Every structure is written in structure tokens, then in C-alpha cells.
Amino acid sequence: MRILGVNLSNNGSICVLNDGEIELYLEAERLSRKKRDYNCTKLFKYVKNVDKIAISDACWDQHKKKTLISAKNIATLKKKFPNAERYDLRDRHHLTHAACGFYNSEFEEAAVIVVDSSGSNFEEGDECETIFHVKRGRRFHWKVLHKRYNTEDDIGIGFQFDMVSEKCKWGREEAGKVMGLAPYGFYQPSSGLGYLQSSNENAAA
């Protein structure tokens, strides 16, 4: 069975699994030379017939240009692979994070914490933090143990990393770099970033 995974987020990429083995992996920015390119249409020409397609995306409601390009990517997929079974995971943003982390580990069963302030939108609000219980098997077994949503007075940890990244003049899309460096640092009251703590205290009050 050949499965095509498509990531339409700000690191546009595709991956083809052939009977569970990686056959092809490509990132859009490697071909376009545009950092964090999210337009995958140019990648599909390297893919032959597939049986299933799994589509993952970020939440671009506030970015009309990116939303339109995502729609173009999906339209291209439907035209090129009309008989492939499609799984739209765009409303399972935190779940895809959890699955990615879990399947790259050696655990058979685990609790996975996803801290991402830009999760999928639900009636209660945008996903902010989610804890899953996950387990391997013939199918991916998962259960939500806890979920917290963004509110007007609580931006969540993910957006705090966005703010720090902007403070470092890297831009919000480099927040992942800040997260990776965070464990190597320590709190410095004179750093000028203390407003993050005070903003949360005000929100809690």
C-alpha cells in the first residue's frame, strides 16, 4: 500500500510510504529556495500512484493568502489522484503533533503532551494544550485525557514563545527555534522578557 502524507503548513512537505517504508520525502523550500515555503503543488509531480492521502495543515483562517494556496494544493491532489482515498486531518492539529512525536519514539504506549497555541478550532475555542493517551497496534489508538482552549485573556504557552521569538527579532515562525534553545537557558529578570510572566498573572487575576 502506498500512502502520501501532505503537510500544507509553513514547512510544506510530502512523504510517500510504501508498505510502511519511506520511499520519498521532499520539502517545498528545498526546491523553491524560499524558507518555510508552504506551497506543495510543485512536489506532486514526483509522486506516482498512491492508494491513500493524508492531509495535514495549520490553521490559516487569519492568513487568506495561505488559505487560498492550501485550497490550490488540495485541488491539485484531487485532480492528480482522483481514485485515492483521502483523510483530511486539518481539524486534528494537536493529534497529528502527538502522532508524529509518538511514532518517532520507541514507546509502545505513552502519554503525550502537546503545547501549541495554534491548534484546531473547536466550539470551545482554539486548541491550546492537549494531553493524549496513545498506543501502538494495527491502528493508532488514542484518547484525549485533557484539553485546554485559548481564551481572550489567556494566550497559552505557544504564543508566549512567539512573543519571545519576535523579541529576539527572529519572527514568529521561528518560535520552534526558541523552544529548542529554551532548555539550555535560565531565567534572567533583567532580560526584558519579564512581561510574559506579568501578563499571565494579570490574566489569571
Show where each model-derived region lies.
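Short acidic/glycine-rich loops and adjacent helix/strand connectors
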Residues: 1-205
